[in-house]
């Protein structure tokens, strides 16, 4: 079941995000020393509270048997676009369709928020993840290299269909 995140969910969401993105960090050799701004290391209670209360981001958690095992948020952008952030599922609950449910829910929520397009950023070198998003209709739009990351940031987008 997917529910909107409340303040009392924040700490658990931080744990879910950090645990989920840690597998990516491990796979690509990312550490707090070489990629301190990477999601697995940079997500904090204060940051998520700012997202929720400062930026008013819609944030959602996936509950499985009463515990949070997945998460995503939407950052509303100009021109009726939004950015999908931190869509994740903890490793023990992967390959059960939860990620797909979260993504489809994100599309639904973005549409309800009058977004015409959803943008995402990924670790470009993560070919499996890129292919997964492409399977849902995302199109690769470019890359950018930042000095503070040892990987390349890849960008993708999907236009939402009118209903």
Model-predicted segments: where are they?
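Conserved G/P- and acidic residue-centered "switch" motifs that form tight phosphate/ATP-binding loops
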Residues: 97
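Residues forming the Rossmann-fold NAD(P)(H) cofactor-binding site
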Residues: 100
């Amino acid at each position: 079941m997917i529910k909107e995140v409340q303040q009392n969910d924040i700490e658990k969401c931080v744990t879910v995000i950090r645990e989920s993105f840690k597998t990516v960090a491990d796979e690509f050799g990312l550490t707090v020393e070489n990629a301190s701004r990477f999601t697995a290391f940079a997500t904090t209670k204060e940051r998520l509270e700012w997202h929720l209360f400062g930026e008013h981001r819609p944030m959602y958690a996936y509950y499985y048997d009463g515990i949070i095992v997945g998460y995503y948020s939407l950052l509303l952008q100009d021109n009726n676009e939004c950015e999908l952030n931190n869509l994740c599922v903890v490793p023990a609950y992967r390959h059960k369709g939860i990620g797909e449910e979260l993504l489809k829910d994100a599309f639904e929520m973005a549409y309800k928020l009058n977004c015409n397009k959803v943008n995402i950023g990924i670790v470009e070198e993560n070919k499996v993840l890129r292919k997964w998003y492409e399977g849902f209709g995302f199109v690769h739009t470019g890359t950018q290299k930042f000095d503070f990351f040892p990987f390349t940031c890849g960008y993708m987008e999907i236009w939402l269909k009118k209903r």
